[in-house]
């Protein structure tokens, strides 16, 4: 998909989010990172809340950065339930920059992903170990029907709360559901 933002827009938002995190958290002498995985709608946010009960970790989830996209409102108006496809590249770029910057400075992190592939969590674990981090991988797995229903319920709940909803495309959800078992076997 064609890039729908400028490098300058990305850099400005990245710097804003980075400042926000740095103003609320401090680097650690013995940093920890938790890599969270699971299909969309499985309950990763609930697991994240349990791990971060004392608010000691910066939580990085690409979905949290959609609303910062410079054309977020227009994309949502034009594409509705499919809008997440048009902000995915943006979310990935912001996420990668934050992981890189905060990782080098040794902040405690929680990084949320889907385990759509085995390569990314292996790459991240290796990178963080080289930086001196204690690395943990936590996975939430439920039946595909339950997680698909979870994505629909999340979408409807966001509408009720007056938030801009995001819908996980069924094909993406199903891809992760069908891949996660083999990917976990590869990782372990």
Briefly describe each language-model feature range.
Residues 1-26:
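N-terminal pre-Walker A segment at the start of P-loop NTPase domains
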Residues 23-31, 102-103:
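Phosphate-binding P-loop
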Residues 39-40:
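The conserved Walker
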Residues 44:
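Conserved lysine of the Walker
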Residues 47:
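Hydrophobic positions on the alpha1 helix immediately C-terminal to the Walker A/P-loop
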Residues 55-131:
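Conserved nucleotide-sensing/catalytic segment adjacent to the nucleotide-binding pocket
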Residues 115-158:
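ATP-dependent NMP and nucleoside kinases share a basic, alpha-helical "lid"
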Residues 149-188:
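Conserved GTP-binding G-domain of TRAFAC-class P-loop NTPases and closely related GTPase folds
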């Amino acid at each position: 998909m064609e890039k729908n933002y400028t490098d300058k827009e990305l850099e400005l938002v990245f710097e804003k989010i980075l400042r926000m995190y740095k103003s609320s958290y401090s680097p650690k002498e013995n940093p920890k990172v938790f890599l969270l995985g699971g299909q969309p709608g499985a309950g990763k946010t609930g697991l994240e809340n349990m791990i971060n009960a004392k608010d000691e970790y910066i939580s990085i989830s690409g979905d949290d950065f959609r609303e910062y996209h410079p054309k977020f409102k227009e994309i949502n108006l034009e594409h509705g339930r499919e809008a997440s496809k048009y902000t995915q590249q943006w979310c990935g770029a912001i996420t990668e920059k934050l992981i890189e910057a905060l990782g080098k400075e040794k902040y405690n992190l929680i990084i949320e992903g889907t385990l759509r592939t085995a390569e990314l969590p292996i790459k991240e674990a290796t990178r963080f170990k080289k930086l001196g981090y204690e690395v943990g991988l936590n996975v939430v797995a439920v039946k595909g029907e339950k997680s698909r229903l979870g994505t629909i319920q999340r979408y409807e709940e966001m509408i009720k709360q007056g938030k801009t909803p995001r819908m996980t495309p069924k094909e993406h959800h199903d891809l992760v559901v069908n891949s996660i078992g083999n990917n976990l076997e590869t990782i372990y």
